[in-house]
From Swiss-Prot:
CDD domains named among the record's database cross-references: Urease_beta (cd00407)
GO cellular-component term (any): urease complex
Subcellular compartments: Cytoplasm
Protein name: Urease subunit beta
Amino acid sequence: MIPGELLPLEGEIELNAGRETVTLTVANTGDRPIQVGSHFHFYEVNAALNFEREPARGMRLDIPAGTAVRFEPGDERTVTLVPLAGSREVYGFNARIEGPLDGKGKKAKGKNK
């Protein structure tokens, strides 16, 4: 073995196997492309993305880590979301939650509802 060498096992790796998912249709109503990364709290994405937000609370895109989905102006596409894991606390992004997802995090406000 060479230091740093990877010896992958045979077969495929299924991402997020057995996890609950939500599928939403999302439209970019803005005049610029919007890109959303794999671990961004989807509930808090750019307000120009039009979709039913409440089912996206506590969810992220079901795509490989480090990748993103790009929404061109006027585009509409279907995305699959999976729940954020770990401590399920959200801070930053667009400051719509700022705390635990499964408890007392503040509710959404403003245009991003």
